[in-house]
Amino acid sequence: MTADLATATAAKEDGLYVYCVARGGGHHVLGPIGLDGQVVYTVGSGNIRAVVHSCPAEPYQSPDARVVEGWVVAHENVVRAATQAFGTVLPMAFDMIVRGGSGGGAVAALKAWMEERCDRLARRLDRLAGRAEYAVQVFWDRQEVAAWLVQGDEALRRMRDEAGS
């Protein structure tokens, strides 16, 4: 899909799903890497660009937790792809959708939002430069951790021994 076709598609939809914001302008197509395989592209305003896909102006919802998990993973994968393509990005929360308004469609609303916040977005991108976001999950067995703690602490061993008698 060309940048012009992506923009034309956005004009027909009433919403834009926003993954992140990065520096730079112009239109770039990242390809069909978005939620449900949507084509992801950028919408630029000045020296700021938003990484988006066209969508209906309503939240993504599913009663199936696996579907929602897939969407969240796809969202994160797009943010990573944008980071590789554009450098520092300011990630948006899952399911951030810009709707068109009385002044035009979703593209016009998004550009107006970026223009109003251009300086603030640039400062946030500057603060994030050279940093990365990580998620850490820790899984542990309570009994093993308790035994390890007791083994290394005399006071805990005494309390364990007193409680057992």
What kind of region is each of these model predictions?
Residues T2-S165:
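An interfacial alpha-helical scaffold signature
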